[in-house]
Structures are given as structure tokens and as C-alpha cells.
């Protein structure tokens, strides 16, 4: 690793003219100077990686190191270096979005060693190149969106390309490295990353400790505007809060009071503009004897907006907002997107209207958080994958008690647990969840994915402060045995940048319900903090605390302005239901763009949201990797842009589960993964003006 220095903006005056005169013989003095975009705050950190000891894709770990179950460590666990944190972040984030098991496909269908044609030819897969790191801000010092550009040594300045890799979830800046960054680097493209203004920013309130752009720690006061995130709380309020609620944490997505999701499209465009600046710095003509000029202007570089989940939604939003030609095309997987639906839009499956579609996340996530623990008790869901560290008896008790409380509140019908659970599941179906995702209702709640999302997004959509303890929830360290809030044996802050995902529970920081001292929300009451879950639901249903306006601010119009685009999503997705995301987006796109649309949609049967879960018993036998099709979609788009090959039409891809014994499914083969067809026949998805009809 070689530090090339810190780029900086300089106020040029009379000295510029003098330098220009002196340097005229060394370059083109008439060329336009490459100027750092005005939204870049402070300095740009530039680092070169040799592709051996360290690299862009694997942080020096290679294919083998990424697959290691043991995380890379720190020489000093209490004060890791920025290089150690970067290595841990790449290891953690790469593994978070793909199946890392050999039987599941790692090292055979994807991985640093697998080339763009799917062959094992790249060895350890280390990629040399240069990184540019900076904040984007509005001048307040409170936005501080992390931007990162990776330029591989294989980049061809005569055939330039950029791929965005906006972070998935609320992850840090490397949050889409395996989902989009890897493909781009292998293609020789620059990668434009950003953390969407969430970025896993954590503030340990008791010690007033925050993270900086590289994950190293600082006192919040001393860090000032260099902090990735500092809670907006006065010193007096902070002291009072710490006294009453010790061992608590603020997180940027939940507690920035900025509703960052409304800016995801804009910051993705900024990441592309920053990538243009970086490429001009590397490959632009030299002027003034030293400075670089502009070689590439908006629209000159083939640019694919790509990512998954929240990053996929951000990519779609960016393409909609692009009015300068920054983005050429879009390829996204399982996008979390909130669509502003026209009243005449219709989603059909097998010719019949689906019961509900186009709901925003604030609606379906709070409903799922309320009902899923009860629905999971249904006998029809017996054998669902178990994704919890709690004893099975504890989990079953939670499910029974949640059903009983829901029934007492009149929210489900039935005189016994089974009838109540059946009603809860029926309500989820009526709300647009597919029966294909039934067996995932339990693991989505048991893993705490849904509770975490419900709490974080409710805070964001109401612009709540950490001291508000919205719906009596907060984030805290807990006693591992009892779940009661307690001081940690060692602060989680040194590693939060490396292993955190930005949405507690994460990195040893848990989601707690404030019953007295506070307890893990699953254990705080027999019904798993039902009162808090109901409160979150009522924020949406009763339109409280500004939630409707803030949700409206994140909606998109599904107008991609004629850009070619591919959406891929698994039919069994129980985190971001396909009826509310991809299907709804395609239907609305038919109104917003009509005949101009170049959008195609591939729906993958037996595909769900978290490929990282595919090695879990019961996931391995039932579900296939959606990531595989995301990569195929990127290849299809590349051939379309470079060779004019037509994109295969919208279709259902009928995959074949691996089967076998849970936890010991046979190895994934190409027989499980049929190709995307140029002539899908009966599997074709019909689209029209405001309509989509997906074959059953």
C-alpha cells in the first residue's frame, strides 16, 4: 500500500496565472483544469495498492482469506489501524452478500478466482489499483457521505467505464463490494462507491466516541466535522440521557434526523461525478506544468448504476434524477424502492390481480414486525429454517405469547394459537407477501432483520433523536446471558466500522426495549415487546410524527428516461416483497415511460433476499443464489451496451433447488441455475402501460 497524498481544493488567484505562464511549455495551458466537485468536503485520501500485499478487491486476503471463517485481526484490539479496519470491512462486507460455501457456489460460480466467463482462472483474485476516499457534504459537516473510487490497474483510459456500488442496507462504503464492485474490477472499470449517508456511523454516547471516515475513533468534540456521525444532542441532554439510559448508542441511519434515504439517488450521482474527477486526475492531460485537465466530461464514460437491496433502490433513484448523462444503464438486484403508484397501475400474477402492491417499506415492515412472530407459529410453516441463537423453546414461547397478545388486542382472530397464527399469515398474504415466502417469515423475524429495519426506519422517517427512545426502543450493549443492558467487557467501537452493518443488532450492539434498565427486545416481555411493535405500526397507520411526509420524500416515479435497465429479484423475498418493489416498479414504469422504456425484469423462483444465509440448514435445500443472476444481468447489459446485443425479455427464471438434507444439500450445479432465456415462451412476463402480469 502506498499513500499518494491528500488532494485538496486550493483558492487560485494571481499565483495561478504565474504558474500557468511558467508551465505553458509543459502542457496545454488552454485546457480546462480538473476541478474537485464542490460537494467534496475537505481532503481526498489517495492510496495505491500493489495487488500482492494489499489490493482493491480482497484487501490482500485473496480468495482463500475471504473464505476463512476467522476474521482478520488487529495488532492492538483497542486501537486498530485504518488499514486493519479496511481489511476487516472488506472481509465482512464481501461475505455479507454472497454464499461463501464451496457447495453453495463460492470459488466455482463466483469469487475472486472466477473470471467474467465463470471460469476458475484468476487464482487468489487480487486486483492492484488506486483508491480515492472523501466526504460529500452540504457545508454543514453533518451529511458526510463517504465516497470511494477504486481504479484498477487494468483500467483502459481509451475504453473507460464506471460501475456504481452504492452500499446495500445501511452498510459502510464497502457494502456492495461483492455485489457490484467485484464484477466492475474484473471488467477493468472504475468503481464508484458511497455509503448513502448511513455508513455504519456509530456514536458511543457514554464515552462520547465516534468513528472517522476510515473507521478509526475519536472524541466527538475533538472530531468535529471530521466525524462520520455525531448525534445532535446538547452536552446537558447527553449527560442526562446517559445517567438514565447508560450503555446506549446512536446510529447514523436511525438518528441523523436527516431521513438520508431521500438523498440516496443524489449521492449516487455524486459518487459518479467524483469518479469522473478521479479518472481525470489519473488520465487527464497535464496542464500548468503539474495540474491535470479534463479528459472526460459527463456522458463520456460508459457508466452502469449497479447494486442490490437499498443500493439497488439508490441506483434506480439516481437514474431517475440524472439530467446530465452521468448514467448509461442500470442493473440492480432486489431493490428496496418506494414507488409513487398511479391509481390505474395493476400488478397481476397468473392473470389475476395480486391483493396488494406498491406499499412503502414503512407500511409492510412495521406490519411484518407485528405479525411475523405469530405467523411463525403456524403448523403450515413447520420445518422453516431456524435462524436464532435463542433456545427453540424460548422462540416458541415468544410466538405463542405474541399470538395471544395480538388476539387480545383484536388484531388477529382465533381462539387458539394455531388459528391465530393462521390468521396472522393470512393477513401477511393479504398485504402482498407471497406464499412462496411463507417459510421465510420466521427467519426474517428470528434473525432480527425485520425488527431492526422497523425500528431504524421508523426513527429515520420521523427524524427522531437518539434521546427520544422512539416507541421505547434503543440500541445498547447487553448481558449475553440475560439480555439486560450492561456495560460491555470491551467497547464494540474499535471494530464497528469493520463488522457492523449500520442497523442494530450489529457488532455487539443490540436492539433493546426500555423496560426499566432495558432488555433485548425479544426477552423484555413475554410477547417480545409487543407494545413497542404496535407503536411502530401506529406511527404509519395513524400518520404520526411526520412519517407520511418523510416517506413521501423517498418515493420514486419509475421514470428511467429511456435508459436500458435490468431488475433482478427473487420471488421468495420476504424482506422486500416483490409485489411492493420490483413488480410495482415495472408496472409504474409502464406509465411513466410507456414506449420509451428499456426496462426488463427477471424474477427468480426459489430466490430470496439474503444469499449469505444460503449455507444455513433449510436455506441450502430450498433456495438458490440470486447473486448468480445479478452477475449474468451485468454481463448481458455489458454486451448490450458494447455490442448491441438485445436484452432478453422480462421473464420468470425457473430454478431448481438443491434439495437433500438441511445443512448437507448437494453441491450447486448449473442444473440448478438455468440461463436467462432469449425466448422465454410461457415464462415471459407481460408488461404494458401500467400493468405487469407474472406467470405463476
UniProtKB/Swiss-Prot annotation:
Belongs to the D-(-)-3-hydroxybutyrate oligomer hydrolase family. It is found in: Secreted. One of its GO terms (biological process) is butyrate metabolic process. GO terms for cellular component: extracellular space. It comes from Burkholderia cenocepacia (strain HI2424). Residues 1-26 form the signal peptide. Keywords: Hydrolase, Secreted, Signal. It catalyses: (3R)-hydroxybutanoate dimer + H2O = 2 (R)-3-hydroxybutanoate + H(+). This is D-(-)-3-hydroxybutyrate oligomer hydrolase. Participates in the degradation of poly-3-hydroxybutyrate (PHB). It works downstream of poly(3-hydroxybutyrate) depolymerase, hydrolyzing D(-)-3-hydroxybutyrate oligomers of various length (3HB-oligomers) into 3HB-monomers. Pfam families: 3HBOH. InterPro entries: OHBut_olig_hydro_put. The active site is at 309 (charge relay system).
Amino acid at each position: 500500500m502506498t499513500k499518494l497524498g491528500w488532494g485538496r481544493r486550493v483558492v487560485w488567484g494571481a499565483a495561478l496565472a504565474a504558474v500557468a505562464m511558467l508551465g505553458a511549455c509543459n502542457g496545454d495551458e488552454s485546457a480546462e483544469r480538473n476541478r474537485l466537485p464542490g460537494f467534496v468536503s475537505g481532503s481526498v485520501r489517495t492510496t495505491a495498492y500493489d495487488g500482492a500485499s494489499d489490493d482493491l478487491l480482497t484487501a490482500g486476503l485473496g480468495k482463500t482469506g475471504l473464505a476463512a471463517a476467522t476474521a482478520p485481526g488487529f495488532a492492538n484490539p483497542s486501537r486498530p489501524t485504518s488499514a486493519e479496519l479496511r481489511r476487516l470491512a472488506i472481509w465482512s462486507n464481501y461475505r455479507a452478500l454472497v454464499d461463501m460455501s464451496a457447495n453453495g457456489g463460492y470459488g466455482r460460480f463466483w469469487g475472486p478466482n472466477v473470471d467474467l466467463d465463470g471460469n476458475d482462472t484468476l487464482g487468489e483474485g487480487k486486483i492492484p489499483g488506486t483508491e480515492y476516499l472523501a466526504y460529500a457534504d452540504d457545508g454543514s459537516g453533518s451529511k458526510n457521505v463517504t465516497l470511494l473510487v477504486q481504479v484498477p490497474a487494468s483500467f483502459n483510459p481509451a475504453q473507460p467505464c464506471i460501475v456504481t456500488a452504492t452500499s446495500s442496507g445501511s452498510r459502510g462504503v464497502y457494502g456492495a463490494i461483492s455485489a457490484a464492485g467485484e464484477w466492475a474490477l474484473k471488467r477493468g472499470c472504475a468503481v464508484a462507491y458511497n455509503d448513502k449517508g448511513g455508513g455504519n456511523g456509530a456514536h458511543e454516547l457514554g464515552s462520547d466516541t465516534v468513528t472517522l471516515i476510515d473507521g478509526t475513533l475519536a472524541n466527538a468534540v475533538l472530531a468535529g466535522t471530521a466525524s462520520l456521525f455525531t448525534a445532535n444532542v446538547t452536552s446537558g441532554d447527553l449527560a442526562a440521557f446517559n445517567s438514565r439510559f447508560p450503555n446506549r448508542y446512536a446510529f447514523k441511519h436511525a438518528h441523523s434526523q436527516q431521513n438520508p434515504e431521500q438523498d440516496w439517488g443524489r449521492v449516487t450521482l455524486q459518487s459518479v461525478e467524483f469518479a469522473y474527477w478521479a479518472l481525470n486526475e489519473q488520465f487527464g492531460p497535464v496542464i500548468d506544468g503539474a495540474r491535470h485537465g479534463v479528459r472526460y466530461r459527463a456522458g463520456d464514460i460508459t457508466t452502469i448504476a449497479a447494486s442490490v437491496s437499498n443500493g439497488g433502490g439508490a441506483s434506480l433513484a439516481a437514474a431517475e434524477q440524472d439530467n446530465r448523462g452521468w448514467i448509461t444503464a442500470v442493473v440492480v438486484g432486489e431493490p428496496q424502492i418506494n414507488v409513487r403508484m398511479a391509481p390505474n397501475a395493476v400488478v397481476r400474477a397468473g392473470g389475476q390481480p395480486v391483493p396488494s402492491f406498491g406499499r412503502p417499506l414503512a407500511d409492510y415492515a412495521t406490519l411484518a414486525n407485528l405479525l411475523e412472530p405469530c405467523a411463525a407459529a403456524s403448523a403450515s410453516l413447520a420445518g422453516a429454517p431456524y435462524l436464532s441463537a435463542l433456545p427453540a423453546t424460548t422462540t416458541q414461547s415468544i410466538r405463542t405469547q405474541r399470538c395471544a397478545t395480538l388476539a387480545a388486542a383484536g388484531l388477529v382472530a382465533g381462539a387458539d394459537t394455531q388459528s391465530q397464527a393462521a390468521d396472522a399469515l393470512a393477513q401477511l398474504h393479504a398485504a402482498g407477501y407471497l406464499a412462496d415466502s411463507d417459510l421465510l417469515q420466521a427467519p426474517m423475524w428470528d434473525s432480527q432483520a425485520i425488527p431492526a429495519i422497523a425500528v431504524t426506519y421508523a426513527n429515520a422517517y420521523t427524524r427522531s433523536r437518539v434521546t427520544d427512545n422512539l416507541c421505547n426502543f434503543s440500541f445498547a450493549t447487553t448481558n449475553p446471558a440475560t439480555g439486560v443492558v450492561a456495560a460491555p467487557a470491551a467497547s464494540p467501537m474499535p471494530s464497528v466500522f469493520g463488522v457492523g452493518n449500520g442497523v442494530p443488532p450489529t457488532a455487539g450492539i443490540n436492539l433493546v426495549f426500555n423496560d426499566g434498565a432495558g432488555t433485548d427486545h425479544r426477552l423484555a416481555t413475554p410477547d417480545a415487546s409487543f407494545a413497542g411493535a404496535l407503536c411502530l405500526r401506529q406511527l404509519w397507520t395513524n400518520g404520526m410524527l411526520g412519517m407520511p411526509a418523510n416517506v413521501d420524500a423517498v418515493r420514486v416515479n419509475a421514470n428511467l428516461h429511456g435508459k436500458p435497465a435490468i431488475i433482478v429479484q427473487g420471488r421468495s423475498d420476504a424482506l422486500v416483497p416483490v409485489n411492493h418493489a420490483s413488480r410495482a416498479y415495472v408496472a409504474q414504469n409502464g406509465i411513466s415511460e410507456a414506449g420509451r422504456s428499456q426496462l426488463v425484469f427477471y424474477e427468480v423462483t426459489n430466490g430470496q433476499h439474503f444469499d449469505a444465509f444460503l449455507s444455513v440448514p433449510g436455506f441450502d435445500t430450498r433456495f438458490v443464489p440470486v447473486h448468480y443472476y445479478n452477475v449474468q444481468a451485468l454481463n448481458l447489459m455489458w454486451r448490450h451496451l458494447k455490442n448491441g446485443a438485445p436484452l432478453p425479455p422480462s421473464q420468470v427464471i425457473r430454478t431448481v433447488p438443491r434439495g437433500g438434507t438441511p445443512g448437507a444439500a448437494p453441491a450447486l450445479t448449473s442444473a440448478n441455475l438455468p440461463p436467462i432465456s432469449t425466448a422465454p415462451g410461457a415464462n415471459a412476463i407481460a408488461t404494458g402501460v401500467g400493468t405487469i402480469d407474472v406467470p405463476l
